[in-house]
């Protein structure tokens, strides 16, 4: 098995050369990159040529972000059950959705992965290789194809426990460990398989997670469901790496997180600490600075994965574009945003998809505030906690009561796009905002509209970005809203 030192050495040997090379231009002739995230099921249900016709005619799309490795419904499959079906595609939910690798799996590229790579082949569409189906037809139209992969797994894959995290109490959890060599070897194998086997233009990978601190505090939308005792990772690989680096003592880390767990559980139950929530949190953090160090340790591991995947792809095909999907939590959590420093990240990024989902952003921010006012910010009423975050994050949107129904404005997209452009200034990295089109929200909450979509796309380009990615997936989008994006591109003469 490849150890961490060899893993980093392999990545570093090609990363330097790759970093010096200029990323390929977004499109010929200086036109903007107009991307669309789309899964295999859409081409199967509607026909490849028909889907490409719709994307080009309605959305002015010139780049496909083809979902090829995921076990999640966020980027693959039809509309999620419980949400209304769009006005195209089969009018039935795919309740038998499975997920996996929608291309051909070539085992020779996967070494020491802990699982059989063949077991990751998606069974949803039989023997169909969606990459071979779509890629030549896209190329014939002058469309680029970037393969879209994410850190979402099934838990019934034989041997998957070898890749999983271990929590505070020694239990296996469903997250994959960022420092696990089996996991890392699988990801670099996936990159090699895709880059050697197909004439692709790029690869994007996303991991919508944070480390133990953010998880324990529930510092994300939907965070009330987080279990502060199941944080990680404390597997043999993480502990060995930490001891080799010598920056923290593992037992001190565990003791600190157990104290944090007590605080979170008491806070969630409504028991106010004598000195309040935030003072108590800082007291724990001061007594156990290892808590913060372990959060950094996790993010360092994630960055090492980025660097290795980037280096592997560029060693095979120097002109391929490699980049990352940056989680929507970047718009909500100051803790998470602090880890998204674009200058060092640019060293292993040809592009960054910065999620700026305006329509669902209001609902998600309200959910985030609901979670963190049950832990760290419990001293504040929800509206005051929201205003505090608005000030910290330079966000100016509506009230806590309003935002689930109004969503965020196009101004949010423009401000975030400008901030990202400034953050990446002087680097080779292109900023491509992720634009929300019909991402599911709760009943009666804000829904996408053609005008709202048009405004968001225009706002992104007014900020000076070189491209946008229409998200999350074509199979949940209403055609009129997709046309709103295309109208913006054509009106601004960017197509």
Task: Please tell me what each predicted stretch does.
Residues 63-123:
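Aromatic-lined carbohydrate-binding/catalytic grooves of carbohydrate-active enzymes
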Residues 34-36, 64-66, 145-147, 203-205, ...:
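Hydrophobic faces of well-ordered beta-strands that scaffold small-molecule active sites
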Residues 1-15:
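N-terminal secretory signal peptides and thylakoid transit peptides that target proteins
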Residues 50-72, 197-200, 463-467:
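Catalytic domains of carbohydrate-active enzymes, especially glycoside hydrolases
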Residues 349-363, 406-419, 423-487:
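Substrate-binding cleft of secreted/luminal carbohydrate-active enzymes
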Residues 42-58, 96-136, 186, 301-307, ...:
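Aromatic- and glycine-enriched glycan-recognition loops and surfaces
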């Amino acid at each position: 098995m490849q150890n961490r030192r060899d893993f980093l050495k392999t990545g570093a040997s090609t990363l330097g050369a790759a970093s010096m090379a200029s990323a390929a231009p977004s499109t010929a002739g200086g036109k903007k990159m107009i991307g669309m995230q789309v899964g295999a099921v859409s081409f199967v249900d509607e026909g490849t040529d028909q889907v490409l016709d719709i994307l080009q005619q309605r959305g002015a799309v010139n780049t496909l972000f083809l979902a090829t490795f995921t076990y999640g419904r966020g980027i693959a499959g039809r509309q999620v059950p419980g949400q209304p079906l769009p006005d195209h595609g089969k009018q039935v939910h795919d309740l038998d959705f499975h997920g996996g690798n929608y291309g051909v799996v070539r085992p020779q590229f996967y070494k020491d992965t802990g699982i059989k790579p063949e077991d990751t082949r998606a069974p949803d569409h039989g023997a169909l290789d969606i990459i071979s189906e779509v890629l030549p037809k896209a190329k014939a139209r002058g469309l680029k194809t970037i393969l879209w992969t994410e850190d979402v797994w099934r838990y019934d894959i034989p041997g998957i426990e070898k890749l999983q995290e271990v929590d505070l109490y020694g239990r296996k959890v469903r997250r994959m460990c960022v420092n696990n060599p089996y996991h890392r070897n699988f990801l670099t194998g996936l990159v090699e398989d895709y880059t050697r086997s197909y004439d692709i233009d790029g690869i994007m990978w996303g991991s919508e997670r944070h480390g133990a601190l953010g998880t324990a505090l529930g510092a994300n939308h939907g965070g009330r469901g987080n279990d502060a005792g199941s944080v990680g990772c404390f597997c043999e690989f993480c502990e060995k790496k930490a001891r080799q680096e010598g920056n923290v003592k593992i037992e001190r880390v565990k003791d600190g997180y157990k104290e944090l767990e007590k605080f979170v559980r008491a806070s969630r139950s409504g028991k106010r600490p004598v000195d309040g929530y935030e003072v108590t949190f800082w007291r724990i953090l001061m007594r156990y600075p290892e808590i913060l160090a372990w959060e950094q340790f996790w993010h360092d591991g994630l960055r090492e994965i980025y660097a290795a995947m980037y280096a592997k792809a560029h060693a095979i095909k120097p002109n391929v574009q490699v980049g990352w999907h940056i989680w929507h939590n970047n718009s909500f959590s100051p803790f998470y945003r602090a880890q998204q420093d674009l200058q060092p990240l640019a060293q292993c990024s040809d592009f960054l998809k910065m999620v700026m989902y305006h329509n669902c952003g209001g609902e998600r921010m309200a959910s985030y505030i609901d979670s963190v006012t049950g832990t760290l910010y419990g001293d504040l009423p929800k509206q005051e906690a929201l205003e505090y975050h608005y000030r910290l994050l330079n966000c100016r949107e509506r009230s806590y009561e309003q935002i689930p129904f109004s969503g965020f404005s196009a101004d949010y997209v423009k401000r975030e796009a400008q901030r990202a452009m400034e953050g990446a200034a002087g680097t080779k990295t292109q900023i491509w905002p992720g634009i929300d089109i019909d991402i599911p929200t709760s009943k009666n909450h804000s829904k996408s509209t053609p005008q709202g979509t048009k405004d968001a796309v225009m706002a992104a380009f007014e900020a000076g970005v070189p491209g946008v990615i229409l998200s999350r997936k074509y199979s949940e989008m209403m055609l009129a809203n997709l046309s709103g994006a295309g109208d913006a591109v054509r009106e601004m003469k960017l197509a």
